[in-house]
From Swiss-Prot:
One of its GO terms (molecular function) is lysine-tRNA ligase activity. Belongs to the class-II aminoacyl-tRNA synthetase family. Homodimer. It comes from the Bacteria. GO terms for biological process: lysyl-tRNA aminoacylation. Mg(2+) 1 binds at residues 411, 418. This is Lysine--tRNA ligase. GO terms for cellular component: cytosol. It is found in: Cytoplasm. It is an enzyme of class 6 (ligase). Its main location: cytoplasm.
Amino acid sequence: MSDQQLDQHELQQEENKLIAQRKEKLAAVREARAIAFPNDFRRDAYFADLQKQYADKTKEELEAAAIPVKVAGRIMLNRGSFIVLQDSSERLQVYVNRKTLPEETLAEIKTWDLGDIIGAEGVLARSGKGDLYVDMTSVRLLTKSLRPLPDKHHGLTDTEQRYRQRYVDLMVNEETRHTFRVRSQVIAHIRRFLSERGFLEVETPMLQTIPGGAAAKPFETHHNALDMAMFLRIAPELYLKRLVVGGFEKVFEINRNFRNEGVSTRHNPEFTMLEFYQAYADYEDNMDLTEELFRELAQAVLGTTDVPYGDKVFHFGEPFVRLSVFDSILKYNPEISAADLNDVEKARAIAKKAGAKVLGHEGLGKLQVMIFEELVEHKLEQPHFITRYPFEVSPLARRNDEDPSVTDRFELFIGGREIANAYSELNDAEDQAERFMLQVKEKDAGDDEAMHYDADFINALEYGMPPTAGEGIGIDRLVMLLTNSPSIRDVILFPHMRPQA
């Protein structure tokens, strides 16, 4: 057994010992009272609200006012005379007043452990150092914790353990709690932003008979009652556009997508996406709307449009760069010429050399995108709208009027990561049917991510869809930026993990 394994074994033995001791204490609680886990305590204040409301009250003013409060929280520190509690908002001290608390309560307090949850009544007071606290007149145990909190000196520092036991991570790491509060703020702000502009929030199917709306490999399941194969959705796009056909001219959805692909710092098989569609608009309108949204989000969450991330700062207050796929390759790779990019064989050779997985049947447009992904994408630090994607890789986007080989599409990159994907929607039913057939050929040639043919969607387009622009924004990656989080797992409460050995 290695030294590390020995240390782990000793730690586990110590933890088991502590758990056994706590179970003995719980047994004593069960014996002493009829209800070991009471549910009749009602608090009337959160710690953060108390700190804010009484911030300007002096020690003498609080003493004269004798403000009664009922608070509850988890014991994070026990200093004898003072117990530090934590609720969902903040930490606050409660004072173990030996003059006012009964002897039996004082004796019970000595048996409590870190992690236990208590409810306390008392009056607000301020210490000589200026700290607000509750001078307890009564207190009782609400929940006995059977497992010890992580060591107070080291905390929960193992990254994988933080992801696997997020409930412990949230207990002991304020930074984690802050991240998920910000995530909630971001989603709430997006909803408000779109609702104020006339968008209707909708819900579309998570289980679909035909996975569509993105180039991705789906999760497959089986509907027993209907005896049919179904798929977890990879995107809501085709259903949202059906709603535009039906007359809802501005719609959005914030919900989960599922893609049966790899796990990395940027990818989780289950992730949250915002998709929105607006009739009588194009992809340039969406660029303007996206810039406005991102600036508002940064200002609301950070109080500034300068977004720190690692050792960089992204400037959301400045105009986002707008550059085509073709021009971006030339700009960031001066050794590549326009003639090279317009020659299939030369483009294939460049893509192979760059490390792209070239199968041999790709057209020029797809090869150009492969080159972009390998040689340009990671260099796009400040916000970039990359536009005019080839139609081969944009089966749902409208062709550009001046150059039909490309589409009216953009992807937004920040910090070398794709954050959003948008385009003027293809509303020509015949063109869409042809592109679906091209995707079917790609799938038959071995491309697992190529789209299926969706006859009902073609049927919907044949009724007529107004000129429309649509966009998808990855909520998880956006929250990563706004919370300075290096991994997507840091912003998903319960990320997918490999089984433990």
